[in-house]
Amino acid sequence: MSPRASSATAHELSRSGLLSSLPGETLAKLAQRMTREDVPAGAAVVREGEDGDRFYVVLSGVLATTQESLGPRGLLRPGDTFGEVALAMDVPRTASVRALTPAVVASCDRATFDEFVRPLFAED
């Protein structure tokens, strides 16, 4: 994966069901702190069992999730998120994610996740 200099945009993040409830100003602040990354087809973004230190939003492309014990688990498309389980529960990655097509993801570190995203789980 190669990080780009640009951050995600609030509009791109607003397509995520998880993040869509954030006010526009908050979404814009989160977008500024996220890093946009190009992911070539076939490349792994995260691997099951690794330490989870980033949260991801799919901006374009299709990615597949797999678990060693269960095999393929599903597809991720624009607006979908991953990485939140490892960060929210402080556990190793529970699945691997690999790009099926060229993809773009936006990601943030644990501190940004804790500030902007973790509170959304308390609302459920």
Language-model segments: what does each one mean?
Residues M1-D124:
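Cytosolic regulatory regions built on CNB/CRP/Popeye-like sensor folds
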